[in-house]
Amino acid sequence: MKFGKRLKHQIQQTLPEWRNKFLCYKDLKKLVRLISLAPMSLGVSVGKAEAEFVYLLNVEIEKFNSFFMEQEEDFIIRHSELQQRIQRVCSTLGPEGSQPSETDYKDEMERIRKDIINFHGEMVLLVNYSNINYTGLAKILKKYDKRTGGLLRLPFIQKVLQQPFFTTDLVSKLIKECESTIDRLFPTVKQKNKRADMVERSNTTTDGLNIFRNTVAALETMQEMRSGSSTYSHFSLPPLNIPEPDLIRSVQLNSPIPIP
């Protein structure tokens, strides 16, 4: 699948409020074509055209950084609140709590489980947001250099690698901690009970279902973009260092619908 179609599909699959935060790849692609076809006799110098192109790329990067940092800050707060909530429920309603109640404890932990799954999914979506926008920038810069004879790609990508939106270490750490919490509090259901458990969880919210489906789509996109190919270069994203089964399991665990 060509990148433009993949990006369009990913935007359609993501959360509605995120859709205008992605790279304007189609517009930039049109601009590259216009620059490459414009006769220099019209008075448009190569330097001026390149400056305009770089300006638009910088506007896109500012958009990515602003959105990414806003989401990252929100995730830090939500992660802390979830941990405090878990501790509070366990210390109050748990078997060794100050006011133990099996029914209330079970109900609260079920709500926490759904919130953790949704939270995990949103964080995976943000990592995918970083990946797909970086890939888009690398591809549009490659097109620019190829069609204009410019040498913009290497220095610009070196700049991109230092941008906040590309630095996903903190979010990846939160994802790992979230997965550890899931494994600790909600062990994987045995196979013979899995179907009944899926039916029981089918009452989850529409938002939860949407986040789950979008997360699966994001994981598939990340695997595709990071897999080795004949066009792999030092501009490409490295392969995922987490095996796909673990990624899928971490999302499927206690999810409302099974992944084929």
PLM regions and their residue ranges:
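Mixed-charge, low-complexity intrinsically disordered segments
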Residues: 145, 151-182, 186-190
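Phospho-regulated, Ser/Thr/Pro-rich intrinsically disordered or coiled-coil terminal scaffolds
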Residues: 1-135, 141, 161, 190-194, ...
